């Protein structure tokens, strides 16, 4: 295997969107074209019992929302594609943000009837901060939606990124006729036996169809006043190519995939803590853990650490360093994924995502290196939780299952664990309410441990250096706790309590996460 050639073939990207924009459906269609599934099962299949391939966890199947990041790999057009389907629900932004650290590009799915929605904007900010390319898919043209020019304007005004339409819709909803493909200079037809037609045939095909006349006017306007196409600007994350289509009817998706693979970047390097970039073509293997998932196979109660390979080649059975602990590990049981199905990996290269079976060795953010390399990559973002619950086992006889479940789910990074400094009582912290619901559901379903949860409301959280801590600083308005790494942390009742503390202890430095 020529490693350099293999790395050049890799395209690793995440799909981001607001809930219900059609993200899971387009993921299904991409897998369909990659030959990984025989038919695309959409989220709407909830009533029929056919579930989306990428929504594999029980609670996702029940609700039709993605609450964890699935990793899927397929080959298409000479490229090895690693697609990461991220959680669409805002409560799971932590998991999504970490996933966005492991990709080289993003596909942003937008509901053409709704335009840019809140979650899309939040996720776009993370992508923009990383400076990776964004490819936009305006979805649901099979339904009536907003004017294409309005959608482009909103994209530029709200997200602050220039856009270039790669195609343009001819009608929409019941009047949808197809796409005017500006990039490939052809027509893509929605109805009839022929998939494509030349632009010259447009007048003959559509006659005096008012929608086609409107398209010609719009394109003339775009040619005069629109942005110029620039591959350089796309790769710099300054220009987003915009594709229109319908994931549900699988229209425009294949053209999107082919064009995306043409322009999406090959694997990037990754920054170490000293600021130096590790090049993907470095011969030495390196990677980082961006996600840990327990119970991907409920029959085996397993844990998988998802690793983005940054450089070199992984070979089964290789020994790696874990600089955080100063210890080593052997990577013998390693898989690659198609949502819930997986296969053992013999080798993989920079850009690939591999799953390492984990018995509690790894944590989110860990760096893996080989040989004399003991460096660490820059830390992944961590988040300050906003709402808290006290949690305990409902049945004292189930304490062992309760502790195992809490330990594993916390290590996934899906929820944060704190202990009352004095009593040792468990408290959970989350970004949003849904995280608590998923935690409770999984504790009962996967660990057979019912839990009692009592709301503590919103808290303002700040970390304090152990050397600055005096337990007498704690009061009814600022409870003292330890995080899962035994670092002291204050849970302030509100901003007023925080300001009061800061005034009383001006020399004490309080730290806030993202």
From Swiss-Prot:
Compartments where found: Cytoplasm
InterPro entries: EF-G-like_DII, EFG_III/V, G_TR_CS, P-loop_NTPase, PrfC, RF3_C, RF3_dom_3_sf, RF3_GTP-bd
Any one GO MF annotation of this record: GTP binding
Keywords of this entry: Cytoplasm, GTP-binding, Nucleotide-binding, Protein biosynthesis
GO BP term, pick one: regulation of translational termination
Domain tr-type G stretches: 8-268
Family: Belongs to the TRAFAC class translation factor GTPase superfamily. Classic translation factor GTPase family. PrfC subfamily.
The protein, known as: Peptide chain release factor 3
Species of the source: Streptococcus pneumoniae serotype 19F (strain G54)
């Amino acid at each position: 295997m020529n490693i350099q050639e293999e790395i050049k073939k890799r395209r690793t990207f995440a799909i981001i969107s607001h809930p219900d924009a059609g993200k899971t459906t387009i993921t299904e269609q991409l897998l369909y074209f990659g030959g990984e599934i025989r038919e695309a099962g959409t989220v709407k299949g909830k009533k029929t019992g056919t579930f989306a391939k990428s929504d594999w966890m029980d609670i996702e199947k029940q609700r039709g929302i993605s609450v964890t990041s699935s990793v899927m790999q397929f080959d298409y057009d000479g490229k090895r594609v690693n697609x990461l389907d991220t959680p669409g629900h805002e409560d799971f932004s932590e998991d999504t943000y970490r996933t966005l650290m492991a990709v080289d590009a993003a596909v942003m799915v937008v509901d053409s009837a709704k335009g840019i929605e809140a979650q899309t904007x939040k996720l776009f900010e993370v992508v923009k901060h990383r400076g990776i390319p964004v490819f936009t898919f305006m979805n649901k043209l099979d339904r009536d939606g907003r004017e294409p020019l309005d959608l482009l304007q909103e994209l530029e005004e709200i997200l602050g990124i220039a856009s270039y339409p790669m195609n343009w819709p001819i009608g929409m909803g019941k009047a949808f006729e197809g796409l005017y493909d500006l990039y490939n200079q052809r027509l893509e037809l929605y109805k009839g036996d022929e998939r494509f037609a030349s632009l010259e045939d447009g007048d003959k095909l559509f006659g005096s169809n008012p929608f086609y006349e409107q398209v010609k006017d719009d394109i003339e306007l775009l040619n005069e006043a629109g942005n110029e196409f620039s591959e350089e600007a796309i790769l710099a994350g300054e220009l987003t190519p915009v594709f229109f289509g319908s994931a549900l009817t699988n229209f425009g998706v294949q053209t999107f995939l082919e064009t995306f693979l043409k322009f999406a970047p090959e694997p990037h390097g990754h920054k170490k803590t000293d600021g130096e970039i590790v090049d993907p073509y470095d011969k030495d293997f390196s990677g980082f853990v961006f996600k840990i998932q327990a119970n991907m196979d409920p029959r085996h109660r397993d844990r998988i650490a998802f690793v983005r390979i940054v450089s070199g080649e992984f070979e089964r059975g290789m020994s790696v360093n874990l600089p955080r602990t100063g210890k080593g590990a052997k990577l013998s049981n390693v898989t690659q994924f198609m949502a819930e199905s997986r296969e053992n990996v013999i080798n993989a290269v920079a850009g690939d995502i591999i799953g390492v079976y984990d018995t509690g060795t790894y944590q989110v953010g860990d760096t893996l290196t080989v040989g004399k390399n003991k460096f660490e990559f820059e830390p992944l973002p961590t988040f300050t939780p906003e709402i808290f619950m006290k949690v305990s086992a409902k049945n004292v006889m189930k304490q062992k299952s309760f502790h195992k479940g809490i330990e594993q789910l916390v290590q996934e990074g899906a929820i944060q664990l704190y202990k009352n400094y004095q009593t040792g009582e468990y408290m959970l912290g989350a970004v949003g309410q849904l995280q608590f619901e998923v935690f409770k559901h999984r504790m009962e379903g996967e660990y057979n441990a019912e839990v009692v949860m009592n709301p503590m409301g919103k808290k303002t959280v700040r970390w304090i250096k152990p050397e600055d801590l005096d337990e007498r600083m704690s009061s009814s308005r600022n409870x003292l706790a330890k995080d899962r790494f035994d670092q002291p942390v204050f849970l302030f009742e509100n901003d007023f309590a925080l300001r009061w503390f800061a005034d009383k202890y001006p020399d004490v430095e309080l730290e806030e996460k993202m």
